[in-house]
């Protein structure tokens, strides 16, 4: 399972909101880039960021802060908040962000997501599905649409989306545990990578997400409140995450001349994924 430690940016500061309410703000740092470096040092392989001001205003606000976060670390960064046009996407990618998260526009204009995928590639486009009581919220969670989270997720899959960040707004910033059931439904019904967001409060919550077969989890307040030790979580849930580097590939200890061929001149083999142990 991939872990995504989160940095929410408001007025250039690292903050957390309760249930997405902009009048319920806790400031954790005036230097978000230092938080990012700490996450990388703890072993994080990916960092999640949100421009909260941008989400509310509909355009990027904290560009310089996001740029400094990206330049301070060597791991990829994903970012959401205020991305409404193809030009916005290009601007954010130019900041050093690896992939962008699009929420409101996915609801209002699904064709925009297809155009974004066609132009930038599916690996750089993530859709944010943020729900209140099962219905998708937009514009910084200030408005609720008539679309269900599942219907939007399925529609996004049909146009080529490979990754969705699912947030249960009622859980966000509350340290009350994630909505595992609904997140698993999205994962099972769509078959694409679902990243759970909202409510992570302890290692047990991460275990439940992992056991449900969900691709990833975003952790925010639980790290800042020292309820989850990021380094310990990375060691437990991402034990094979860094093995993608060539230097970590296992080396064969047998030469070809030692192998026995069958009657057809072929070598019978069992192929196993060296990261997760799955027999392919």
Model segments located where?
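Structural preference for beta-strand elements that scaffold enzyme active sites
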Residues: 2-6, 46, 74-78, 98-101, ...
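Conserved, mostly hydrophobic/aromatic
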Residues: 8, 39, 47, 79, ...
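Conserved anion-binding
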Residues: 11-23, 90-93, 97-172
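Glycine-rich, proline-tolerant flexible connector loops at the mouths of alpha/beta enzymes
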Residues: 46-64, 104, 109, 165-176
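Charged helix-capping and loop-helix junction motifs
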Residues: 60-67, 142-151, 176-185
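Catalytic cores of alpha/beta
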Residues: 73-99, 181-219
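C-terminal helical cap(s) of enzyme catalytic domains, especially alpha/beta-barrels
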Residues: 113-119, 187, 206-244
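Flexible "arm" and connector segments at domain edges
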Residues: 239-280
